[in-house]
Each structure stands twice: as C-alpha cells, then as structure tokens.
Amino acid sequence: MANINENYLKLKAGYLFPEISKRVKTYSEKNPSAKIIRLGIGDVTLPIVPSVVDAMIAASKEMGTAGGFHGYGPEQGYSFLLKSIANNDYGSLGIKIDESEIFVSDGSKCDCGNIQEIFSTDAKIAVSDPVYPVYVDTNVMAGRTGEIGADGRYSNLIYMPATKENGFQPEIPKEKADIIYLCYPNNPTGTVTTKKALRAWVEYAKKNNSIILYDSAYEAFISEPGVPRSIYEVAGAKEVAIEFRSFSKTAGFTGLRCAYIVIPKELKGRTRGGEEVSINSLWSRRHTTKFNGVSYVTQKGAEACYSPQGKKEIQASIAYYMSNAAKIREGLKKAGYEVFGGVNAPYIWLKTSDNLSSWDFFDRLLDKAQVVGTPGSGFGPAGEGYFRLSAFGKKEDVEEAIARISFL
C-alpha cells in the first residue's frame, strides 16, 4: 500500500464551496418547493457575448477543414492572443509586456494554485485574512503551512488581517515573507488598493527578496479613476511581482476556461547556494511539462474580447453585474446592514446581523429567505462575523433576494 501525502490531512474539513452546496442540497431535499436564490459562488449568469460566439463558431468551422485544422498548439498560447493581451491589457496602461512573458492557461484558480510549485517548500508565505482559500490550501498541500491551530490559523503562515479598522488593507508584515499573495480588486471583501500602497509592497519585496503574487482577476470591474489596474503600474514591480488575469468573470468564460499569468523576465529567484534563476524560465518549464495549452477555438474567442465590438459587448455585461452590485449594496444599507465593496468589484462584504457567526447567518438566510451567500469565516478567521454576496446573479433574482433579506 502506497504512502500518501499527509499534508492533505491538514486541510480544513471540506473546501468552502462544496460545504455550501452540501447544506443547500440538504435544505432543498427538505423543502422541494422552495425557490432558492444563489448569490454565493462567483459564477456568471449572462451568456457569452455575440462577438466571442461568432469568433468561436468561425474557429470551429476552420478546424473542420484540412487547411485550418489545429492540433496541439503552443503551450504558452497562440501569438495572436498573446499580442492582443500585451497591447490591450498592458499597452493601454503604458506598460510594456513582451509576448514571452505571458502564459495562457485554463484559469486563474489553476495558476494561483500551481505557481507555488516552483518555489522552495520551506518558503515563508504571507496571505491576507480573509483570503481566497486556494492560496492557503495549495500551500497546505505542499507542506509549507504547519499545523492548523484552534484559532483556525496555520502555524507557519504569516496572516495579514484585513479588517474594517484598517480599511481592509493588510498591513505589511514586520517579519520576512518569501511569497506574498495580494488580490485587488479583492475577493472576498470587494475593496481596492492604491498606488501608494502598492509602492510600499514593492519596496518591501525588494528589501526582503520577496515575490508578490498579484491576483488581478477582477480588474475589469474597476470603475473609479485612479484605482490601479495592474501592479506593474508601480516602478520596479516587474522585478518582484507575478500577475494573474482571467477571462472568466470579465468575459463570462467560467465554462470555457481561459486565463493568463504574466511573469516578467526581470523577476529572479535564488537557489540555496545563492545563484540567480529566471522565474519566467522555471514557470515555462513547469507549464510546458504539465499543460498542453488552451484550445485554439477558446483562444480565438478570447482574442475576440479585444475587438472594438467585443469590448463594447463585454462592457455591457460588466455594467449589468455592477448594477446588481449597486442594488445589493444600497438595498442592504437601507435594511440596516454595514456593507463594504461593490463599487469596483462584483462582491459585497457585509457584517452579519445580531452578532451571528458567519455560518449561523448563512443558515438564517437560507432558512428564512432562501438566499445563498458565502460565510466570511470560510475565507479565514478574520472573516468571522462577515458574509459575501456576489453580483453575478440575474437582475430579477438580485432584486428579489434583497427584498427577502430586507424583511428578515
């Protein structure tokens, strides 16, 4: 009998979203006629926009011809998409990113989870609290986190509390962290950061030879001027940061799967002997060994997102979701809830009522209003007493959900 990776046994029982699904299923079986409105997991509800559909249809037909068939493509991504990403997502900000610094993948969740494989197993990890669970769980699996304590924290992780008191801006740790996870616009709190704050993180990373893993999957939802869209807007960030982007929420690709990671050539790591190593080269080796690339048809769809008509259609979808966010935010405020986020991000972070725990509030909403959200404690100990609602639902469902919650 083979031995197992015992680090998996250190994971908290049940990943957050499967636990939510389990509770909803139990409730539905007992209440089969109940209309449940789901504002929990951040899956989109609008269909793929016409420009993308048309591009994928054309690509599919192309694949049905002898001259247009594509088998295994370049693992890093087709040049047509890499060029579109570099020109539109970065060139528009005055940031120069080379095609060789972009790696197309099947999702930011995969990239955020896989990137840790190229770093030492004794690397010291820093995460905000609350935090997207994937950052923590993949490092638990790799053996970096130590044991979990009674307070829900792992002994070897550096936790950076993001609270109401500090504006949900995690403070820079006093100790040295090798790898720092940052997410803006933030999941789960829906808040954003400033260039001044990012400059401080870049300075810390340079001083401590740290690497910042910057998850910018929700960048397209930023509406206010002056809010940074990329960490590379900060001078020197290319020397210390990796950035993650996704088409999932931006263009509704949750079922198609397409994202990308940017690793600048300037970014270096070190061996135990002190030798500098290119992080871009390391990731390229890992990426091409374990991944065969995103399909040609999907990448043609992603390319269409950058066409003038594609941009217009996608902006309309984003406006739809952000209108939902405004409805949730204002509706909850009128109902007496303390709310955060929902302005530059599709998530609303609220304080639970009556000092209920996050899971007790989940059960109350499900039982009394048939509304499903996400317990804040599932994102970390500092999320206890908070709750996340997603703006990715249908307009009519969002309006009904807020009406139901208001009557509680």
Swiss-Prot record:
<dbReference type="InterPro" id="IPR015424">
    <property type="entry name" value="PyrdxlP-dep_Trfase"/>
</dbReference>
<comment type="similarity">
    <text>Belongs to the class-I pyridoxal-phosphate-dependent aminotransferase family. LL-diaminopimelate aminotransferase subfamily.</text>
</comment>
<dbReference type="InterPro" id="IPR019942">
    <property type="entry name" value="DapL/ALD1"/>
</dbReference>
<comment type="subunit">
    <text>Homodimer.</text>
</comment>
<feature type="binding site">
    <location>
        <begin position="108"/>
        <end position="109"/>
    </location>
    <ligand>
        <name>pyridoxal 5'-phosphate</name>
    </ligand>
</feature>
<feature type="binding site">
    <location>
        <position position="292"/>
    </location>
    <ligand>
        <name>pyridoxal 5'-phosphate</name>
    </ligand>
</feature>
<feature type="binding site">
    <location>
        <position position="42"/>
    </location>
    <ligand>
        <name>substrate</name>
    </ligand>
</feature>
<dbReference type="InterPro" id="IPR015421">
    <property type="entry name" value="PyrdxlP-dep_Trfase_major"/>
</dbReference>
<feature type="binding site">
    <location>
        <position position="388"/>
    </location>
    <ligand>
        <name>substrate</name>
    </ligand>
</feature>
<feature type="binding site">
    <location>
        <position position="187"/>
    </location>
    <ligand>
        <name>substrate</name>
    </ligand>
</feature>
<dbReference type="GO" id="GO:0010285">
    <property type="term" value="F:L,L-diaminopimelate aminotransferase activity"/>
</dbReference>
<feature type="binding site">
    <location>
        <position position="257"/>
    </location>
    <ligand>
        <name>pyridoxal 5'-phosphate</name>
    </ligand>
</feature>
<keyword id="KW-0663">Pyridoxal phosphate</keyword>
<keyword id="KW-0808">Transferase</keyword>
<feature type="binding site">
    <location>
        <position position="15"/>
    </location>
    <ligand>
        <name>substrate</name>
    </ligand>
</feature>
<comment type="function">
    <text>Involved in the synthesis of meso-diaminopimelate (m-DAP or DL-DAP), required for both lysine and peptidoglycan biosynthesis. Catalyzes the direct conversion of tetrahydrodipicolinate to LL-diaminopimelate.</text>
</comment>
<feature type="modified residue" description="N6-(pyridoxal phosphate)lysine">
    <location>
        <position position="249"/>
    </location>
</feature>
<keyword id="KW-0032">Aminotransferase</keyword>
<feature type="binding site">
    <location>
        <position position="187"/>
    </location>
    <ligand>
        <name>pyridoxal 5'-phosphate</name>
    </ligand>
</feature>
<feature type="binding site">
    <location>
        <position position="218"/>
    </location>
    <ligand>
        <name>pyridoxal 5'-phosphate</name>
    </ligand>
</feature>
<feature type="binding site">
    <location>
        <position position="109"/>
    </location>
    <ligand>
        <name>substrate</name>
    </ligand>
</feature>
<dbReference type="Pfam" id="PF00155">
    <property type="entry name" value="Aminotran_1_2"/>
</dbReference>
<feature type="binding site">
    <location>
        <position position="132"/>
    </location>
    <ligand>
        <name>substrate</name>
    </ligand>
</feature>
<feature type="binding site">
    <location>
        <begin position="246"/>
        <end position="248"/>
    </location>
    <ligand>
        <name>pyridoxal 5'-phosphate</name>
    </ligand>
</feature>
<dbReference type="InterPro" id="IPR015422">
    <property type="entry name" value="PyrdxlP-dep_Trfase_small"/>
</dbReference>
<dbReference type="InterPro" id="IPR004839">
    <property type="entry name" value="Aminotransferase_I/II_large"/>
</dbReference>
<dbReference type="GO" id="GO:0030170">
    <property type="term" value="F:pyridoxal phosphate binding"/>
</dbReference>
<dbReference type="GO" id="GO:0033362">
    <property type="term" value="P:lysine biosynthetic process via diaminopimelate, diaminopimelate-aminotransferase pathway"/>
</dbReference>
<feature type="binding site">
    <location>
        <position position="292"/>
    </location>
    <ligand>
        <name>substrate</name>
    </ligand>
</feature>
<feature type="binding site">
    <location>
        <position position="72"/>
    </location>
    <ligand>
        <name>pyridoxal 5'-phosphate</name>
    </ligand>
</feature>
<feature type="binding site">
    <location>
        <position position="132"/>
    </location>
    <ligand>
        <name>pyridoxal 5'-phosphate</name>
    </ligand>
</feature>
<protein>
    <recommendedName>
        <fullName>LL-diaminopimelate aminotransferase</fullName>
        <ecNumber>2.6.1.83</ecNumber>
    </recommendedName>
</protein>
<comment type="pathway">
    <text>Amino-acid biosynthesis; L-lysine biosynthesis via DAP pathway; LL-2,6-diaminopimelate from (S)-tetrahydrodipicolinate (aminotransferase route): step 1/1.</text>
</comment>
